[in-house]
Amino acid sequence: MLDILRDNPLLLLFIVAGIGYPLGRVRIGGIHLGVAAVLFVGLAFGALDPSLKLPEIVYQFGLALFVYCVGLSSGHGFLRSFRGKGVIYNLLTLGVILLAAALLLIPHYLLSLRPGETAGVFAGLLTSTPALAAAVEYLTRAGAAGQLSDPVVGYSIAYPASVLGVILAIYLAERCFRIDYRAEARTLKDVPGVSPEITCWTLRVCRPKAFGRTVRDLVAEHRLQVVFGRIRRGDHADVVSWETHLEEGDLVTAVGPVEELERAAQVIGCVSEVQADLDRSEVDMREVFVSNPEVAGRTLRELNLPNRFGAVVSRVWRGDLQLLPYADMPLELGDRVRVLSRRERQQEVAAYLGDSYRAISEIDIAVLGLGMALGIGLGLVPIPLPGGITVRLGLAGGPLIVALFLGARQRTGSLVWVLPYSANMLLRQMGLTIFLAAVGTRSGYEFAQMLTQPRGWAILGASAAIIVLLSWVMLYVGYRWLRIPMGLLTGMVAGMQTQSATLGFALDQAGNDLPTVGYAMVYPMAMVVKIVLAPVIIAVLT
């Protein structure tokens, strides 16, 4: 059987994925590994024979595909995150990484580790292959060819312990703080990846200060975060525009979170018992898929639907996430939008947005290939650092940074960079599964061999203890002191660790896309800092 698997890496890949993926759904004591279970199944198979490993190209392909898709979906939120507390979040991550380097001095001296081994444990502890490469390159430049295996050994031991340790820390934090991700998501505002619960109220204009005022003036003056849909004046109904003047007795529908609707009611009058949204005789609503490439990547402000069609977008569904539209929200391929317009213009609006389910099931391979090529190319560019060290962003950093940039831009001319939500999720999951299966089989044998030695167990135990402590410190400080939402924070922990498996677990636990925002927010800084620190550790300890 081993000979068959050795000679057929594709068979090995699908067996590891086929066993690991369903195994990750099994809950033990309320916890499940999710897609991260593929990594541990890969380790088990890799431990059986040194030649039982997937080709390097498989690992590279899965990693590049996964991080590129994560970057595309996080690009818009990544830039928005730095308008608020993004700097604080990155400083927290930086502090934890520096703490990791400091704590490694304990096992370095207690276990008499060589500098290269300590640097390898650092890279494995924070699961950074680029940092491992930087450590190996430093030893090569220093003429220490006989020590090139030291970082690799330390990395192979610490890596699996680190992944499991962080997952354990997240699980303990969820239990300790009694996290309810759904309840948490409902309370969040202006955070990419989640949306508070949205509902529709009918408001009656009965406050004198609102009489004769335009919707634009009232929204700007009171900063109302609601979408006004239709207005009923006497027996006549129409779609609300920015220039609509409100008169006494008007019935206006508004969509938004309950607390914002309460504010809107206080501004213009009161809540009406009449449900004006049920009257569809003149103004109707229709849910439409965004499938027109000419529309994708453009903001609602650019599309200017009220002036073009007399239409208003009142809700946007992206995957399972229901979003409240705002002027600078870019529409993406695969979005499902609820459009209000006069009945005679419904078909016209739908045709403009696309409304083709088949179209959003297709992927522009040319654009996908171009984007990934740009990312892989960036990862190959050598970056000189002080001390004669040259590093590269690699397959993890290059595609992610390019994808963050492209995801923020959404489109360039006729090129639509973002993928339909369903296609992005499919490619992301496939890439992550391939990556985990490959890295598990490639590390399994060395990992098993080191565990036959007491020293290997000591390094493993120290690595596990340090990463659990680091993760717990980050989770506790972030949640208790900085009041960071746990969904965002678990993604930040995965970004600090630059670990796709941890992100997969965090996504499974949260049930929304908030962890990807935290991951993308801190990943670039974390990756660069670890690349710099790995050779510095060797230089300082030599």
Swiss-Prot record:
Family matches, as Pfam families: Asp-Al_Ex (PF06826), TrkA_C (PF02080)
Position of the signal peptide: none
Gene Ontology molecular function, alphabetical: monoatomic cation transmembrane transporter activity
One GO biological process term: potassium ion transport
Subcellular location field: Cell membrane
UniProt feature coiled coil, ranges: none
An example Gene Ontology CC term for this record: plasma membrane
Membrane protein topology class: Multi-pass membrane protein
Residue span(s) of domain RCK C-terminal: 186-270, 273-356
Entry-linked NCBIfam families: YidE_YbjL_dupl
Name the record gives this protein: Uncharacterized transporter STH2172
Naturally occurring in which organism (per UniProt): Symbiobacterium thermophilum (strain DSM 24528 / JCM 14929 / IAM 14863 / T)
Taxonomy of the source species: Bacteria, Bacillati, Bacillota, Clostridia, Eubacteriales
